[in-house]
Design a protein with these regions (language model features):
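Short, contiguous acidic and Ser/Thr-rich linear segments
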Residues: 82-92
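Eukaryote-biased recognition of intrinsically disordered, low-complexity regulatory segments
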Residues: 63-83
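Glycine-rich phosphate/adenylate-binding loop and adjacent beta-alpha elements
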Residues: 127-149
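Short linear motifs in low-complexity or flexible loops
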Residues: 2, 8-10, 16, 24-25, ...
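Intrinsic disorder at enzyme termini
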Residues: 35, 41-61, 286-288, 292-303
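Short, structured protein-protein interaction patches enriched in aromatics and acidic/basic residues
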Residues: 115-122
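Ferredoxin-type iron-sulfur electron-transfer modules in oxidoreductases and energy-metabolism complexes
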Residues: 92-107, 150-306
Length: 306
């Protein structure tokens, strides 16, 4: 299981079994909302921060019983599903339940988390077939029946729900995701807050690298060279920044056969982003910028984009 890439069709079939309402293009409606100027901030999304700033110390007797089916895997062993029954209140999150399982039932259950309040993004998992932050997903919002929890797709699994984020970081490096300042005399940067440049950057800058969008992307499923939505979203913020001096070099990566040209625009990344970002829109803007560049400098500056 570790390190293996999933075929796109297998991913679709697997998700459809877990979440009958899932569709490869489910994010298009979310992208349309974003295009109309609606942006759901973290506090407005289901399972927001209210009421979950404290660690959960235990369940109150008499609370409802929820069943979590967790995908377990250890190196050298076969993956298996294991059921756990936990007491759950109205504000109990998936992360609360996992912590209770680890403390009281199965100390060997492995998962990753840090802040517990929706700030770090380290607790990303797939719950009932959809990518979510465990700390921001109340069990009460998941409906009746058994709740499935598995690791993110398209990442090597280290153990149980813990995935290796190294490929995510490598994709970021591949597109030159670091800001590159100019040499010579240092000058104060002046980018007006009401400029189109600043506004477009601000709409895409809040990515915290949780990896949910990469897990939801169907192109990453069968093309290991595709940078993925998070890396392309980051590239957009840099290509739009007039202070960055690596934009020409970065275009060489973005206009390769396996980057912008490969996105199918299904907007799954936009649909699952907990920060309310729209990576699909950033990719569309990069294509528009690339098209203008090609018209200006000639077709040798880029391949077929669409």
């Amino acid at each position: 299981m570790a390190g293996q890439e999933l075929d796109a069709q297998a991913v679709h079939q697997r998700r459809a079994r877990v979440d009958p309402g899932w569709h490869p293009a489910r994010g298009l409606s979310r992208l349309a909302e974003s295009a109309r100027g609606h942006r759901a901030g973290p506090a407005l999304r289901p399972g927001g921060l209210a009421g979950r700033h404290r660690p959960r110390r235990g369940c109150v007797r008499g609370e409802a019983i929820a069943t979590l089916r967790v995908l377990r895997w250890l190196p050298g062993a076969d993956e298996r599903w294991q059921d756990y029954a936990v007491e759950a209140g109205a504000d109990t999150t998936v992360l609360d339940a996992l912590v209770e399982i680890q403390r009281g039932q199965d100390p060997g259950l492995a998962f990753r988390y840090a802040c517990r309040v929706g700030m770090c993004g380290s607790c990303g998992v797939v719950v009932n077939g959809r990518e979510r932050w465990a700390c921001r997903t109340p069990l009460s919002t998941l409906g009746p029946g058994r709740i499935t929890v598995r690791p993110l797709y398209h990442f090597p699994v280290l153990r149980d729900l813990v995935v290796d984020m190294a490929p995510f970081t490598a994709r970021m490096r591949a597109v030159g995701a670091a800001f590159t300042p100019g040499d010579g005399e240092r000058r104060d940067a002046r980018i007006s807050g009401d400029s189109a440049e600043r506004q477009e950057i601000d709409e895409a800058i809040e990515c915290i690298g949780c990896g949910l969008c990469v897990s939801a992307c169907t192109i990453v499923a069968h093309n290991a060279r595709f940078p993925g939505p998070a890396a392309l979203n980051r590239a957009f913020t840099l290509q739009r920044d007039s202070r960055d001096t690596a934009r020409s070099t970065r275009w060489g990566v973005l206009l390769s056969d396996d980057a912008l040209a490969r996105c199918h625009g299904q907007a799954n990344c936009t649909d699952v982003c907990p920060m309310g970002l729209a990576p699909t829109r950033s990719i569309i803007r990069l294509r528009q910028m690339a098209t203008a560049r090609i018209f200006k400098w000639g077709p040798r500056y880029g391949p077929r984009l669409f």
